[in-house]
Amino acid sequence: MAFDEEWIPKTRLGKLVMEGQVASMEEAIKSGLPIREPQIIDMLLPDLEDEVLDINMVQRMTDSGRRVKFRATVIVGNRNGYVGLGQAKDVQVGPAIRKAIDAAKLDITYIHRGCGSWECACGLPHTVPYEVTGKAGSVSVTLIPAPRGLGIAAGNTATKVLEKAGIKDVWTKTFGTTRSTLNFAKATFDALNQVNVMRLPVYCKEEA
């Protein structure tokens, strides 16, 4: 999405990005400064894509009566390692989606990819480097390295998350109530984050 031309940065990192002193996401991450403005992501990742995973109507009873809001769950990514998941609520669907997109941008992370399948030795970053598992609520998702050309063997929600992260080939195992789109997406996103927990050997690192 295009960033607002009238954006006035309020954070130190935002000012550095606006001044051109930080010109890439790699530099932003290495700076150690928190990303608190979605416009930073708009400027550093102009090819970022977003997709709505789920929209639910939630209700809450108050003293003044029943309050109804819409909860939107959105995934963003550039299909090349950067991916973020966000959710937000609002009384209208449109604002809920926009808030969820901003939340996903602020939660964006870089996922290391590799060629971790014993059936493949291409050395390209097309799958996860090793088996990882993520959990959210009752849902558990395990990502298993797959050979190049297999594709994504996963449910619809998990596939959307993995595609935005740039994963092209992977086996998956799921447990729990995967009909819950929110927890299914969160568990898949958590599994991707587990890749960054372990230190990667040299042969698993992506090409520059």
From Swiss-Prot:
Pfam families: Ribosomal_S5 (PF00333), Ribosomal_S5_C (PF03719). PROSITE patterns: RIBOSOMAL_S5, S5_DSRBD. The keyword rRNA-binding applies. It comes from the Archaea. Part of the 30S ribosomal subunit. Contacts protein S4. With S4 and S12 plays an important role in translational accuracy. PANTHER family: 40S RIBOSOMAL PROTEIN S2, RIBOSOMAL S SUBUNIT. The N-terminal domain interacts with the head of the 30S subunit; the C-terminal domain interacts with the body and contacts protein S4. The interaction surface between S4 and S5 is involved in control of translational fidelity. This is Small ribosomal subunit protein uS5. It comes from Methanosarcina barkeri (strain Fusaro / DSM 804).
